[in-house]
A protein has these predicted regions:
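Positively charged, glycine-rich low-complexity segments
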Residues: 1-150, 156-201, 213, 217-221, ...
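Intrinsically disordered, low-complexity regulatory regions
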Residues: 204, 224-227
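Conserved small/polar residues in nucleotide/adenosyl-binding loops
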Residues: 234-241
Length: 241
């Protein structure tokens, strides 16, 4: 409940920043978001579970984004268990980093990185090694430098033999070279890749959470506007794949 209270408090800040971007009808839903909560409980009332509430469902709402992330993380966990058991696959977690950019370049850079990602996953080596993936764009904000870092988190399904078969295995160094090549940015110094040995809650939450942290995008109106514009662009591009 403490986490919910914190998110609800941030919703008050969110209302001020989102107002210029939505119509009055949507704004009414945002103002009333989660003002009604219905719980189910056991006989002792010691264990309670949220049963129903009125949600605005805006992707930037701190409460709705938090609740959706928890739900999506559970969905990913169940999906992974099913694929491991029924398809006999394993998973790797890949993070593709990029240089920081200013607000005015964020939109164009995300569009370019989205294109680069699609290009990389059409490479013969990657097609042979991967059996499916889920990706998520995350944007973080550096307050001291006033710039943004867009990067991709990618959950990739691979054959069990991937880790021992040299024909298909892609090392961290090779992932880095591929990412540098498709982006054309030799300054990229690292990518992170690791085998998921079990359903790691931290990695699943990274995949499930929204593209930005509310602690970042609710700093001020300027930062919020940059996140809002750029994340809408990414959603549109991703839907076109």
């Amino acid at each position: 409940m403490e986490k919910y209270t914190e998110k609800k408090r941030r919703n008050q800040v969110f209302q001020k920043f989102i107002e210029r971007h939505v119509k009055e009808g949507q704004m009414d839903l945002i103002r009333e978001c989660n003002t009604f909560l219905s719980f189910v409980a056991d006989k002792t009332l010691e264990k309670q579970k949220l049963h129903k509430s009125n949600l605005c469902k805006n992707r930037f709402c701190p409460v709705c984004a938090w609740r959706k992330a928890r739900k999506d993380a559970l969905g990913l966990s169940l999906m992974m268990q099913y694929i491991k058991q029924k398809e006999d696959k394993q998973f790797i977690f890949l993070t593709l980093t990029t240089p920081n950019v200013t607000a005015e370049h964020l939109e164009s850079e995300i569009k370019a990185y989205n294109h680069s990602f699609q290009k990389m996953f059409k490479r013969k080596k990657v097609i042979s090694a991967t059996k499916g993936y889920v990706r998520k764009l995350e944007i973080t904000y550096n307050k001291e430098r006033d710039d943004y870092n867009p990067h991709f988190h990618v959950l990739i399904a691979v054959n069990k033999s991937y880790f021992t078969d040299k024909r298909y295995y892609i090392s961290q160094k090779e992932w880095l070279e591929l990412w540098r090549d498709v982006t054309g940015i030799s300054e990229i110094t690292q990518v992170q890749v690791q085998k998921i040995r079990q359903n790691n809650n931290k990695e699943l939450y990274e995949m499930a959470k929204y593209s930005g942290k509310d602690s970042d995008y609710l700093i001020n109106q300027k930062v919020f506007d940059a996140f809002y514009k750029s994340c809408l662009l990414y959603t549109s591009d991703a839907a076109d794949e």
